[in-house]
Each structure stands twice: as C-alpha cells, then as structure tokens.
Amino acid sequence: MALAAEAVVPPTTGSAAPIVRITALRKSYGSNEVLKGIDLDVRRGEVIAIIGKSGSGKSTLLRCINGLEEFQDGSLSVDGKPLLHDSAMAMRELRQRVGMIFQSFNLFPHLTVGRNVMLAPTLVKKRRAAEAASQARRLLERVGLAEKFDAMPEQLSGGQQQRVAIARALAMEPAVLLCDEITSALDPELVGEVLRVVESLAVEGMTLLMVTHEMSFARKVSDRVIFMHQGRVHEMGPPTSLFGDPQTPELKQFLSSLHD
C-alpha cells in the first residue's frame, strides 16, 4: 500500500500542536476489525474530507473522535486532552469540544427550532434562557433561518432541518466539528443550501472533519482529503494531488467508479 501522505502532507511546525491527534487507533466489532491502526494529526482550522467506499471505516472514525464508539487500542486526544471512556468528566469535556452532525437531523419534534438550538447550552452549560435564546437567534441567522425561530421542525424542509442541526451543534461552541454524510438523506435540490453553510464555516476557520460523497465539494473546500480503504488511511494529501494524481490502484478504481 502506498501512503501518499508522507510526501504531500506538511508537518505540524512550531508550537502549534494538533487539535486532534490519533495514534495507532484500532476498533473492532467482535472479530471484525474496522479500524486497523489509524494515525492522523489535525491542525487547528484545518478542513479534512474523508472519502471511501461504504464499510471502509469512515463514519466509525468520526464516532471514535466524538466518543460515541469505544476503541480497543491506540490513543486519541482533542485539544491536548486524551479521550478516556472510563472518566465521565473527561467524556463530558470532550463532547463540549467536539460537535457532530449526522445524516439524520434528529431534531426534537415537540420543540420549536429555537428551543432545539437552545437545549444543550441551557442543560449542559447552564446558560440563562435569555442568553441562550439570543445565541440561538444569531446562529439561526448565520445558517439563513433567522425567521424560523418559532417554527416546528415538521414545518421545515430537509435542508432547513439539517441547517438547524448545524446551528444546534455550533451552539456548544465546539473546537472541532464532525460532519457524517450530512447531505446523504437530502433531496438533490436541497444539498447546495447545506453545503454553502459548511463552506462558510470552513472560510471562518472552523476545524472540520467531514465524511462526504460530494467530491466536487471536497475538492473545493478541503485542505486535505483522506481516502480510507478496508479500515486504513490508504492515501492522504491535498485535493489537487489526491484527485488529480492518485497513487494506488484502489483510489484510482474508487474515483473511476464515481464517473461510471
């Protein structure tokens, strides 16, 4: 296996430690090993797209970073703090630093849009209702839904619901935002409105790791693209190199299959 990362990924320099550091990470479900020794450093403000076939371990990697999945070997730290599954306090701190947006929107149907965005800051960060409401209004404006504060989720399109989910994740002021195929459940005409919001976050300097099938989007906004294959980081590099000059047969075949 040829790992392109060695040649094309600039090392972290100076005192800027990586905001996410993953070392020799292994994750199994029973006898099925789905992550087979992942090594990855993510710099603050970096945008990384993760691509690959279904079952290659992409979503599992994100769920490990967020603490939703427990790994068997290796280490993972966020902002210098190790992920410790046996420490409830460490896990709470991690989840305040790492936001995650899923394929399904998972909005609370009985709460208004504004209340959905306010919920975590009031419960977890103990913010006053007025302060949380003000923040929710700002975030809804940021994702283009300022007028939907009092609407119910059922009144929104899928694209609008996913933008509310983005606002909800941002309400916890995460240092890192994980996006797990967040457009895959949307009708094609709604994908663009969600991707525009994600692109604006990238421009503003949010650290983003996103599993995506939107290759043109990955090429446009990413600093690095990771191609995962059979539980490993198979190739990694800038989008121009990875898409324009794939080094392994597996990546060449994957990219070719997208155009069949």
Regions found by a protein language model. Give the residues of each.
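ABC family nucleotide-binding domain
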Residues: 17-239
